[in-house]
Amino acid sequence: MAVPARHTSSAKKNRRRTHYKLTAPTVTFDETTGDYRHSHRVSLKGYYKGRKVRDDTK
């Protein structure tokens, strides 16, 4: 079984972990529906870039 040749110090470990971050989701206000939605996604009411692209009638 492989074993590390040197002990990883806490400073080295913490420097490596500085890049493990959570990013906030990009949420924009949709002028057409008045709701918030993710960027580059169809809104829940079926609008994208101000146009109706999905019909919800079933």
Swiss-Prot record:
Keywords: Ribonucleoprotein, Ribosomal protein
Record flagged with keyword Ribonucleoprotein: yes
Basic residues bias (residue ranges): 9-20
Pfam families, per the entry: Ribosomal_L32p (PF01783)
Gene Ontology molecular function: any one: structural constituent of ribosome
Annotated spans, Disordered: 1-23
GO cellular component term of the entry, any: large ribosomal subunit
Highest rank taxon of the organism: Bacteria
InterPro entries: Ribosomal_bL32, Ribosomal_bL32_bact, Ribosomal_zn-bd
HAMAP family named in the record: Ribosomal_bL32
Annotated family: Belongs to the bacterial ribosomal protein bL32 family.
Name of protein: Large ribosomal subunit protein bL32
Organism: Lactococcus lactis subsp. cremoris (Streptococcus cremoris)
Originating gene: rpmF
